């Protein structure tokens, strides 16, 4: 047995040391790459530095197994022979081009628009580099392909020098889609997948049993060996296992947030790290059969498509601070801004949803917590002013606790309390004597009462917004349509910005947003149910039969177990055949889809996907506040399904909220869904047909006004 295996190498003028195997010893930094600084080897904690160093140590981190006779291996070997031959005849060029196209199809997929872009922007060297990091065989899936294509586009259009200066290495591996298929067959899960994909219904409780069956599964020894090779390469650097299915992030189907991603802190002995990684892989595989993913596929007529799951395994972008690992900046960025809260903003320039720490808080809908929304055309403008800047700021941070070996959420104030986090003056403003002040130097005032994450100095003093804006412009031009991205960013000493582009996909715009919608005038006041402002997407929905109404005050007073179960009950109602056949208006307190049940109803995509209008009722006395959450996976679901989102402020006289109609109209819940009868006082189903009426909604995205009334 090898007791000590060390990789020593030089890159440029720097010498590196990386322990791959150490028998019967362990420390928290033992398996990190180290760089020689003077007479000492120092660990590389920043992800970009580590990725750059380790990627130079070997051409292919995965040790070769037995030679495969798979067709794509034959194509790869033939193309490699041509590439390494210095005297390729001119007559061979058509064959080389055909082989390159075939290898791209075998690795990346078959979508014509994507392959056209791949033909333009991927070189043979790019395809070889991808091939050298594929575990098993098969395609790498939509998420991985989209990320790699976006990087190739930026590299070509920016030029090598600018690209290298700005972009952080992504340092990724790809678990081929054939590994998923093999895992299903080997562990008697294939029939289950076919049954669920083709229409069998499953509850969230039953899905837990599906997860358990996946967790009991096993991989072939050759795949386990490659997993081990990859983990030796990463050492103790945190990694993330991300879904990358064949249909994910494709043209027309985003699958935003439908599948799972799992962080691995990657601490402990090699065997402990392997077991944690295997658990993460199995959980992501199981998410191919979760209720939201199945509902999404059915709604888009994709149930009969063979949705194979590849995986994208990436080094987590960030750096260690105390016992935690996280990026200082993360977010989502869109080349088109659907949420222009003032007419000064140019929607075509795009927008950013920015957070401190892991980007999970940028894409998930969290209670009582708000990212910074940045309109790229006017980055210093905010939707909020005055005291509301503090109220609508980020208060919690997601990060990896290396001691606990787990993903945790902490108060931002606790992380920033020491006032010594690098570049903290760029991220926070200081509350002093009731006023919010932007730091004038890197040395923060120790007498300030509170640090508030505003990112004001970051926006003014660095080139981050300009860099993101340029990236979005280049990518949207290459794609020929709006795009959305996920990223992390790091500010180096001296202010230089580096960005790690983690994801890129075509962006879905609401089909009705560009229509001219004129709100009807002279509607008798007794027929108006409510008026709404600050809307994002618009359109006209006529002949609405059902209203699913959750009373805000009764929700506020409901016990916690009832609030926790409410999402499941809404899902039952949503799945009822009569609800599916009619047009539906859903109304409830605070933020639908929030992870915090005190802030709103904790529903998932499959619980609301049959609605036409979603209304968030904001009663500040109950602590319920709507939030557009532009850029979150929840919001992208609304846009993609053309569900009109309307915030309602009953205390605003202009809202004309006819609360009496919703309280006094008879409740059809018990008759329609008898198993939900005990929720009769909290949930109301109104059938407008009972009075021979229908409900109609007009929403004008240009004036950001909407009206709902009885026809």
Segments predicted by a language model, with ranges:
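An acidic intrinsically disordered interaction segment
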Residues: 98-121
């Amino acid at each position: 047995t090898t007791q000590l295996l060390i990789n020593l190498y030089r890159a440029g003028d720097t010498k590196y040391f990386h322990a791959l195997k150490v028998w019967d010893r362990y420390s928290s930094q033992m398996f990190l790459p180290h760089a020689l600084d003077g007479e000492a080897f120092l660990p590389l904690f920043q992800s970009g530095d580590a990725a750059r160093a380790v990627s130079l140590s070997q051409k292919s981190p995965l040790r070769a197994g037995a030679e495969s006779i798979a067709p794509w291996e034959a194509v790869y070997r033939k193309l490699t022979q041509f590439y390494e031959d210095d005297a390729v005849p001119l007559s061979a060029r058509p064959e080389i081009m055909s082989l390159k196209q075939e290898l791209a199809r075998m690795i990346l997929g078959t979508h014509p628009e994507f392959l056209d872009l791949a033909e333009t922007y991927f070189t043979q060297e790019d395809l070889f580099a991808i091939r050298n990091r594929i575990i098993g065989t098969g395609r790498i899936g939509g998420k991985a392909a989209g990320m790699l294509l976006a990087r190739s586009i930026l590299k070509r259009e920016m030029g090598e020098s600018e690209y290298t200066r700005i972009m952080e290495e992504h340092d990724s591996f790809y678990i081929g889609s054939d590994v998923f298929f093999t895992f299903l067959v080997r562990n008697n899960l294939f029939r289950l997948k076919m049954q669920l994909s083709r229409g069998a219904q499953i509850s969230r409780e039953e899905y837990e049993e599906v997860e358990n069956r996946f967790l009991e599964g096993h991989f072939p020894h050759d795949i386990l060996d490659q997993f081990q090779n990859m983990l030796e390469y990463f050492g103790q650097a945190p990694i993330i296992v991300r879904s990358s299915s064949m249909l994910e992030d494709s043209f027309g189907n985003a699958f935003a947030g439908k599948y799972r991603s799992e962080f691995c802190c990657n601490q402990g002995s090699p065997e402990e790290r392997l077991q944690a990684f295997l658990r993460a892989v199995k959980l992501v595989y199981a998410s191919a059969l979760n209720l939201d993913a199945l509902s999404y596929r059915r709604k888009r007529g994709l149930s009969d498509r063979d949705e194979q799951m590849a995986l994208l395994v990436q080094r987590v972008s960030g750096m260690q601070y105390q016992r935690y690992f996280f990026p200082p900046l993360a977010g989502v960025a869109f080349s088109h801004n659907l949420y222009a809260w003032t007419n000064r903003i140019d929607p075509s320039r795009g927008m950013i949803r920015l957070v401190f720490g892991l980007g999970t808080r940028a894409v998930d809908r969290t209670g009582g917590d708000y990212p910074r929304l940045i309109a790229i055309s006017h980055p210093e403008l905010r939707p909020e002013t005055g005291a509301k800047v503090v109220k609508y700021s980020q208060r919690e941070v997601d990060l990896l606790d290396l001691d606990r070996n787990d993903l945790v959420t902490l108060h931002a104030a606790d992380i920033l309390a020491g006032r010594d986090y690098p570049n903290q003056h760029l991220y926070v403003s200081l509350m002093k004597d009731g006023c919010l002040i932007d730091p004038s130097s890197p040395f923060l005032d120790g007498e300030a009462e509170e640090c508030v994450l505003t990112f004001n100095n970051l926006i003014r003093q660095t080139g981050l917004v300009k860099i993101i804006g340029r990236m979005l412009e280049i990518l949207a031009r290459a794609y020929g349509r709006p795009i959305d991205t996920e990223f992390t960013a790091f500010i180096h000493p001296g202010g230089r910005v580096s960005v790690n582009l983690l994801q890129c996909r075509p962006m879905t715009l609401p089909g009705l947003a560009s229509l001219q919608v004129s709100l009807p005038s002279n509607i008798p006041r007794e027929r108006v149910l409510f008026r709404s402002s600050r809307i994002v997407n618009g359109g006209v929905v006529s002949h609405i039969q059902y209203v699913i109404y959750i009373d805000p005050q009764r929700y506020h007073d409901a016990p916690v177990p009832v609030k926790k179960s409410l999402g499941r009950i809404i899902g039952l109602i949503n799945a009822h055949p009569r609800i599916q056949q009619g047009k539906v208006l859903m109304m409830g307190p605070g933020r639908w889809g929030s992870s915090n049940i005190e802030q709103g109803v904790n529903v998932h995509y499959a619980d609301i996907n049959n609605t036409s209008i979603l209304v968030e009722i904001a009663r500040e006395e109950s602590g319920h506040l709507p939030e557009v959450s532009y850029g979150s996976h929840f919001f992208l679901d609304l846009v993609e399904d053309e569900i009109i989102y309307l915030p309602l402020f009953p205390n605003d006289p202009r809202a004309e909220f006819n609360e009496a109609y919703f309280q006094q109209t008879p409740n059809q819940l018990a008759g329609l869904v008898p198993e939900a009868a005990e929720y009769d006082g909290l949930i109301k189903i109104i059938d407008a047909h009972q009075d021979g009426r229908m409900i109609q909604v007009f929403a004008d995205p240009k004036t950001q006004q909407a009206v709902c009334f009885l026809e």
